[in-house]
Amino acid sequence: MSHPPRQSSAVYRRRRLAALGLLAALSAVAGIAVGAGDGSRGDTNRSSADSRVAPKPVELPRGGRRIFPDFRVVAFYGAPQSRELGALGIGTPDQAVRRLEAQAKPYAKRTRPVLPALELLADVANRDPGRDGLYRTRQPSSVIRRYLAAARRAKALLVLDIQPGHADFLAETRHLDRWLREPDVGLALDPEWHTPGAIPGTVIGSVRASKVNQVARHVAAIVRENDLPEKLFVVHQFTPNMIAGKAGVVQPPGLAVTMNVDGFGDRPNKVAKYREFTHDGTRFHRGYKLFYEEDTGLMRPRSVLALQPPPDLIVYE
C-alpha cells in the first residue's frame, strides 16, 4: 500500500488530532500512583515447604511460553478517550473484548489458534505540548489496570502502544516497566507519532533502528530477569523510511519482534505495501493493520490469510 494521498492523509491526521486534543486534560491525572497487575502472579506468602519446590514457569494467557508460530495474534487498537483513536476505545473494555473475540474467530485454525490482544495507547501524541513540552499524554495507570483486567478475563494479551511526540521511546518504555514485568503485557512503538521539532500530526514521524534496539534490549532484559514468556514487541510502519536502518533492528531472545504494516487505503495498494515490507522473508514476524472506517473495502479474514507470507499479527483500528 502506498502512503495515502496527501489530502486524505491530512484529513485523517486532523481527525486524529481533534481526538488527541481531548486528551490534554489527562496530563493532570496521569501521575496517579497505583500498583501494577491484579495479584494474579501468585501469593508471595508461601509456606517454607512450598518455597522448596521450583515454581512452574509462568505461561502465556492461553498456554505455553512462545507466541509465534504457536499462535496468531488478532488485536484491537485504540484508547477509551475517543472512538477516533481506534476500535478498542468503543464501549467498555469488556464490550471491546467481546467484539474482538468475534472478529478474531475466523482467523483461528486447528493448527494455529488465536491469541487476542488489546493494543492500548499508553502514550498518546498530542497537539498540546503539555507542561513538560513533550507533546504526549501518558495514559493514567487506572486505565491501564482496567484494560489489563479485561484482557486477563478473556485470556488475552495487553500491548502498550507508545506515541511519543517529542519524548524518547526508551524513557517512555521505562515509565511502563512495572507493567512490562507482567507476563501478559507487550509493547508497540508507533514511529509515525515520533516528531521531534514538529507538532504531531503535521508531519509523518520516524525512528532510527538504534533507538528501536535500545528499547528492544531493555524489554528483553525484563523478560530474562523475570523468567517471563515470550513478549510481543511491535513496530508500526507505513513508509519505507519510517524505520531508518531497519535491517539493523535486533531480535533479542524473549521478544517476538514484529513489523506491522500500517496505513489505510484500498486493497491493491495495501497488499502491494505488505509485499514491499515483507520481502525480507522470515527475518521479522509480520503484522498487518486494517482500518474499519478509513480502508476502502475492508478486507475479509480469508483475504488477509491469503497474503503471502500470511501475517502473524492482525491489528484492527
For the regions a protein language model found, what residue spans apply to each?
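Active-site groove signature of glycoside hydrolases
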Residues: 182-202, 206, 233-234
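N-terminal export and membrane-targeting signals
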Residues: 2-24
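N-terminal carbohydrate-binding/catalytic regions of secreted carbohydrate-active enzymes
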Residues: 76-148
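Distinct, well-ordered alpha-helical segments
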Residues: 168-180, 243-249
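C-terminal region of N-terminal signal peptides and the immediate post-cleavage residues
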Residues: 29-51
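Structural preference for beta-strand elements that scaffold enzyme active sites
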Residues: 71-75, 113-119, 155-159, 184-188, ...
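Surface-exposed substrate-engagement region within the catalytic domains
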Residues: 203-316
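Active-site beta-loop-alpha junctions enriched in small/polar residues
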Residues: 79-81, 121-125, 163-165, 190-194, ...
